[in-house]
């Protein structure tokens, strides 16, 4: 067991692409966690999706032994965190297990919105924040400007910020020395009753639930009986250890240490994240303050293409939920798509990642409906109901008002692109709250409806500022707005999975775009297919997929007109009969058309 004064627990926080994972690689190399043969780039981004997209999704923890210049050996437990706004809850969970954080800032790009948001989270939790300037070897690096930006925008002193290049390894050993000096050691009670916080869990098919824990007080050892406080169930610890990034078994984890625990828990919900572990024979009375529950902001329906896969989808979602506490799902039935699940996500990136993981790791074919946000509906009898699926909207005569979620978006943008960003926000029905010049950057604050931000705001913001603007957001309130439900009818039948809730001012255009787009996607049938967009009982747009027809007059050479007319009338009657009983299969592209219309309009 390591003496607490020689333990340092810290996280690395930064904006996307500022070099967190590369810096983690250098730490592992310097402290000899892996041999050169095992070393790979971004060794901690273990999921295929993480490596392909070049982003960190799951926070990973590593324990390294560092021989410092004063001769002492320090145990460094560090957690590599994601930088994307959709995964900010992963960051706050990692910070709860640390005493300090490294704020990594790109010396060329300067401070960006996520670094600010994550840094405030760290300061709120009382952590010691060390600013670090990375990519110092770039020709465009400007350390003096970035240091003044850190002081102006975030408000922490940065004149002593360590300058490093994680790619070449320059300055990293100096950073390790600073880290040991400035980040405080843990202050747990090594002799007290056991209290350990579950930072993360995942499901292993052989071991059951594996939990990543931070021991706060006491110690946890092999063959000890432990109790999970929220469920009250006891389990026997089968193995425990640390990641160096490879799993290394140990017999004891002492106060202040971070490691993994396997206790043969087979129930997926047996060790929820944020829970407290204690010893069965000498339990603690108080659980540790856990994490606040994250509320999903974006909802979409996930349906298996083959209805036989429904159970496999349920099992896959359960396993993912253990690893990703922010995923929310419940069963639902659609007339068009059969049985499936209504899933809640933190944002569009989160939704894409979950869908990709389900398709890759669990080998499922899925249909996804267009994402929607949660609306509040005030009914005429005085009750207020949340609605996350347009199909669940009460009839118009029962609705007093519909309220949509409003967020506060904090945007950092270079001055040259300010005009383009402001006009984008106004187009999205935004209200400007604040504008502040800081060095070469401008800090903007806008109130925007979440439904306008969910789909493509991030992509459009990046393209209108050439990738320089950055943004993060927080939920403010629900606010009444003139919203209507837009239904799509195919041959007079409503397709529930294609319904949308839209703002009244753009409903006509949205309906027209949508039926035109559907016309190209629905395959031609032997009979005419009418595609209509309706608000309530009023049809606002229509397009028709023309029927394929056989030339019934091909065999008539000349002859009387009545003979030809008889054949044409017979064909017409057949088509009419067909149209009454004909069923149309709607391809997956048609469901995605709803998304694209939202993005293009």
Curated annotation (Swiss-Prot):
The keyword Cell inner membrane applies. GO terms for biological process: positive regulation of translation. PROSITE patterns: G_TR_1, G_TR_2. It comes from the Bacteria. GO terms for cellular component: plasma membrane. The keyword Cell membrane applies. Belongs to the TRAFAC class translation factor GTPase superfamily. Classic translation factor GTPase family. LepA subfamily. This is Elongation factor 4. It comes from Methylococcus capsulatus (strain ATCC 33009 / NCIMB 11132 / Bath). The lineage of its organism: Bacteria, Pseudomonadati, Pseudomonadota, Gammaproteobacteria, Methylococcales.
